[in-house]
């Protein structure tokens, strides 16, 4: 899975999964996020704009990140995906109620 991580600024990082976020690729994203947390990152922007598909494994990684980050006093923001199917899935599962979304 291709994951783009932009420069950290004041313990904030933007992570942009570029491929499907599913049971096969979710462990790679989880590992990347774990490494960033170990490096002291507190605030995450997860850019889903280029994510064409997401299943429950991908959503579980995001929920886990949100829990861990809130416990550490950090935050998680999600960039709305362009793929209508992913956007609809996030709305149906009410992710838009627990995460802050930006365009």
Model-inferred region functions:
Residues 1-16:
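Short beta-strand/loop segment at the start of cytosolic alpha/beta domains
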Residues 20-98:
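Amphipathic alpha-helical interaction surfaces in cytosolic regulatory modules
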Residues 100-103:
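Short acidic-hydrophobic, aromatic-tinged amphipathic segments that line or gate anion-handling sites
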């Amino acid at each position: 899975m291709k994951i783009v991580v932009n420069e950290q600024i004041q313990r904030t990082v933007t992570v942009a999964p570029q491929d499907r976020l599913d049971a096969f690729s979710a462990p790679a994203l989880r590992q990347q996020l774990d490494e960033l947390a170990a490096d002291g990152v507190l605030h995450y922007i997860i850019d889903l704009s280029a994510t064409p598909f997401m299943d429950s494994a991908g959503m579980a990684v995001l929920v886990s990140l949100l829990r861990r980050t809130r416990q550490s006093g950090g935050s998680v923001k999600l960039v709305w995906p362009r793929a209508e199917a992913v956007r609809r899935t996030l709305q149906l599962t009410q992710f838009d109620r627990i995460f802050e979304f930006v365009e």
